[in-house]
Amino acid sequence: MSDPRKAQEQEPTTHFGFQDVPESQKAEKVAEVFHSVAAKYDLMNDVLSGGLHRLWKRFTIELSGVRPGNRVLDIAGGTGDLTRKFASIVGPTGEVVLADINDSMLKVGRDRLLDKGVAGNVQFVQADAEKLPFPDNHFDVVTIAFGLRNVTHKEDALRSMLRVLKPGGRLLVLEFSKPGNPLLAKVYDTYSFSFMPLAGKLITNDADSYRYLAESIRMHPDQETLKAMMVDAGFERVTYHNMTGGIVALHRGIKP
């Protein structure tokens, strides 16, 4: 008879913030975080970034090159900031799919967009970035904003994104990264591990989720490492743009 404790010991581990957890548990733990913060996610984004997240997303939209009639996949689309803008660009002949693995975030995004009259050319799909349930060569543009760091197997997710893109299609990864200036990095560390959990406690009554978010940012690959991962996954002409001193980076890659 097999010993379940030995099986757990042999299971590969991954990071959940600064903790090492069995790979099979990470998705569930991340889900708990976003179930907790979904209702006030937009408010917290504004508070924690001072509204800068709107500028970062605007630049993502500009660099995406989305045009009328395009088909766009917004992975980890959450409350629908990018989806709403993309839907207005692609128009009635195009399509935007807002995909999120977390049903609480997906519901908030769907309700928010429907309240704003965004309908007709938008679909909402609960989906795992590592195993996207879409046909090969299907989308003109795929985006993932502030979601890749929460994925357990990032390499698998990047390959899955490549698969669903049309040849010549573009992937854009907007994510927290590593500041290049040591002084800025020190200030950012203090802000992340002091102010973020405090704000989480005061606004959502959940300091732990925002402590995890700060830790997950530190564990995410830096700019050059993520660029190399995208190249290894099969993307070409991979570039990145640092924003706010490298606190955030936007990577773009093209499917051959």
From Swiss-Prot:
SUPFAM superfamilies: S-adenosyl-L-methionine-dependent methyltransferases. It comes from the Bacteria. One of its GO terms (molecular function) is 2-methoxy-6-polyprenyl-1,4-benzoquinol methyltransferase activity. Pfam families: Ubie_methyltran (PF01209). It catalyses: a 2-demethylmenaquinol + S-adenosyl-L-methionine = a menaquinol + S-adenosyl-L-homocysteine + H(+); a 2-methoxy-6-(all-trans-polyprenyl)benzene-1,4-diol + S-adenosyl-L-methionine = a 5-methoxy-2-methyl-3-(all-trans-polyprenyl)benzene-1,4-diol + S-adenosyl-L-homocysteine + H(+). Pathway: Quinol/quinone metabolism; menaquinone biosynthesis; menaquinol from 1,4-dihydroxy-2-naphthoate: step 2/2; Cofactor biosynthesis; ubiquinone biosynthesis. Keywords: Menaquinone biosynthesis, Methyltransferase, S-adenosyl-L-methionine, Transferase, Ubiquinone biosynthesis. S-adenosyl-L-methionine binds at residues 79, 100, 128-129. Its EC number is 2.1.1.163, 2.1.1.201. GO terms for biological process: aerobic respiration; menaquinone biosynthetic process; methylation. InterPro entries: SAM-dependent_MTases_sf (IPR029063), UbiE/COQ5_MeTrFase (IPR004033), UbiE/COQ5_MeTrFase_CS (IPR023576). HAMAP family: MenG_UbiE_methyltr. Belongs to the class I-like SAM-binding methyltransferase superfamily. MenG/UbiE family. NCBIfam families: MenG_MenH_UbiE (TIGR01934), PRK00216.1-1 (NF001240), PRK00216.1-5 (NF001244). Methyltransferase required for the conversion of demethylmenaquinol (DMKH2) to menaquinol (MKH2) and the conversion of 2-polyprenyl-6-methoxy-1,4-benzoquinol (DDMQH2) to 2-polyprenyl-3-methyl-6-methoxy-1,4-benzoquinol (DMQH2). This is Ubiquinone/menaquinone biosynthesis C-methyltransferase UbiE. The gene is ubiE.
